[in-house]
């Protein structure tokens, strides 16, 4: 037992040193935090509400990251001190507590090692994530709602802010379409691995004959981009429609045509937003999404061109089936791109195992995304 702990401690110390040296840079983050906090107390800081909001979010994120790093560093030091104390290290109750500390530290190191795989130009950005029901009717709409729950729990575990941008409920149950905005560092870097078709196999609760059904839902992920990235959208290339926002009812459902849908003719891209209170705000949000979708399409075309010359490397097939979720006759979740699989489907649907699938994807595909 003691030898096992010693080996695990050695790996933790190596991981902590590598994280500090090549990724985290706590000194740099502390300096950035001081500079931003100085800006935040200057007169007129809130004159530009958008800029001030972004700086405030960055300050909160830096504080959280530094807190997490210091917590990890302190826990590793405590483990090291414990193992050097021969009397304490023989105590069985203390060993149980030590195991919990090891699991916590190892999980955190693994999370930060995953960040080292996120080197794309937009990986640090927030993102939009859309889920659309495919073939399967009500069953597929229910599948969208199940995936939504999984992604919301997963995003919450990363401390990202979740905004519902657009939603269309199913006629009987579930959701036909939903778009989320995940706000936080590396949201796009992680979530981009989820783009593609997700296949569900289960005995449908909507079938009185209890037959097994196969349903599909597609997931699209595209990064939020700032004004520094130029995307040309000519007025004559778009059509703007307004409509009454939908919802489950109650005081927050608009009674005016405040929801906005924009169609971009050259690409066929359609975006919509009903989250904001006014038509002007929804229109602005739609334009931001449209810019992001068009830019993502340009990136995809560039990657597809690069894939022509990658005969010895795996290709990225946009919109293809990426993962199977089998509930009956056995339980299995398998990624068809990487071969990574787990049998605990409930933990997967609770968002607890998604990071492992994403890391496997990034290891195999990270350099070409």
Swiss-Prot record:
Keywords: Cytoplasm, Methylation, Protein biosynthesis. The keyword Cytoplasm applies. It holds the Pfam family RF-1. One of its GO terms (molecular function) is translation release factor activity, codon specific. Its main location: cytoplasm. Belongs to the prokaryotic/mitochondrial release factor family. The gene for this protein contains a UGA in-frame termination codon after Leu-23; a naturally occurring frameshift enables complete translation of RF-2. This provides a mechanism for the protein to regulate its own production. Peptide chain release factor 2 directs the termination of translation in response to the peptide chain termination codons UGA and UAA. This is Peptide chain release factor 2. It comes from Chlamydia trachomatis serovar D (strain ATCC VR-885 / DSM 19411 / UW-3/Cx).
